[in-house]
Each structure stands twice: as C-alpha cells, then as structure tokens.
Amino acid sequence: MVISARAKIMLLETQNLAIGYEGKTLVQHIQFTLEENQICCLLGANGAGKSTFLKTLLGLQPPIGGDIVWQGKSLSDYSPTELARHIAYVPQAHSHLFPFLVQDMVMMGRSAFLKWYQTPKKSDLDLALMALQELEIAHLAQRYYHQLSGGEKQLVLIARAIAQQAKLLIMDEPTSSLDFGNQIRVLEKIKQLQKQNIALIISTHNPQQAAFLGDNIVLLDQQFGFQQGDKKHLLTLENLAKIYRTSPELLHQHLNNHIEKSL
C-alpha cells in the first residue's frame, strides 16, 4: 500500500497586491504564497519596501490595491485581536523604557486571548515559562528586560511570539544588531521553530542567512518588482547584483562563493 504525503496547507496568499504608503505605490502585482511549516526569507535593498510589505501582511498598513488572504479569508475580515491569534510579529531587539521582568514581557504575547478587563491566568504564565524553556532562556525569567544583552532581548521577543501560539511569525531583520555569536544562536532557534509546524517570514539584508534559513526566497525591488521562488533559482549572484545595485563579480568576491556553495 502506498501512503501519499499529506498536502501542505496554504496559510497566506496575496492576490495582485500593491503596497506603499501615503498613496504612493512602491511595488505592485505581488502574488505571494506561504504554506504551513515554511520559512520564507525576504531580501531587498534599503527602501525597497520590505518593512512596508511586512506591515501590510500584519494588517498594520492598508494595501494600495489587491487583497491578502489568511487561510481562505480576507485579512480585512479579521479584527486586530483575531489576527493576533494567528500571526505574531518579532521586531528587532530594542530598549524598553519600563522595567518589565522577562516573564512579563513574554506574557504580553497572551494579550490577544484576554478581555480588556482580564489579567493573565496561571495558564498564561505557564505558557510564557514554557516558551522561555523552549529557547533555553528560562533562567532569565526574573531578570529585567532592559538589562539584557542584545541577543538575549531578541530571544525574549521570539519567546513572546511563541507564547502567542501563532501559526506564522514575521521577523524584521532579527539579527541586524547582534554580534556574530548571537546571530548564530538566533538563527539556530529560528530553524528549530520550523520543526514545530510554525511558518516564518524573515526580512534580512544577509544573503548567506537567507541561504541557511529559507527554503523559499522573495526578492523585492521597486525597479524589478516582486519575485518568489526556491533559493536554487532565485538566490543567484546575478539576481542579488540587480537588487543591490552592484556587480556579480564584487558579490562573488565579498561573499567568498558562499551563496553558490550553499546551493
């Protein structure tokens, strides 16, 4: 008897999406798809529209045109609270003005499941502590977030998203302000999340990180538009040279052939 593999479930797709702000269109004709348990890395130069694309997918910025569909339903039909139960956002590690304990920062991921008058329950605290344990940072639970290192802060923000129990995590340059060791630690944790049936969209400036993480790549550029595909076909020196306005020869020199070797 032949047992066929289970078909992947489509989580997110865009239909002729146009993105921009204040009425100005940055990129249009975006046909994007994301399946469950898929990592998609988003590459583009500064000002290409990466952050605008992510904000639009998160429902924080309205599209200029087209539609975004989450599990067969238009994103516009979800309330912000409903959407937060499905999609979590992981920003870059940042300083915080208020002295929150790490466990309290992570418990904020449970806010989408609470009424405005409710306080977190023991079950919410348990989920927060489980998320910290999962990332091997449970020892930070009683530390103050603002006193942590950049790498520790980034892992706490990822733990907050895990506590949110979302099916999709959207990360905006999660390693941009980290030293090399912390970059490696964060990247390894991201790979582990995929094994837990979590889909991820990750914006990065680093093609080598995209080659390591992504089974799917998006190239975003105002001149060349939107391209999505597997890394073998898209993550080439020629394509990178186009979006970063440089030459394939210089890229080859500075990347030490890592892109080609990774394929």
UniProtKB/Swiss-Prot annotation:
Residues 12-247 form the ABC transporter domain. It comes from the Bacteria. ATP binds at residues 44-51. One of its GO terms (molecular function) is ATPase-coupled transmembrane transporter activity. Disulfide bonds: none annotated. SMART domains: AAA (SM00382). Keywords: ATP-binding, Nucleotide-binding, Transport. One of its GO terms (cellular component) is ATP-binding cassette (ABC) transporter complex. Belongs to the ABC transporter superfamily. This is Uncharacterized ABC transporter ATP-binding protein HI_1272.
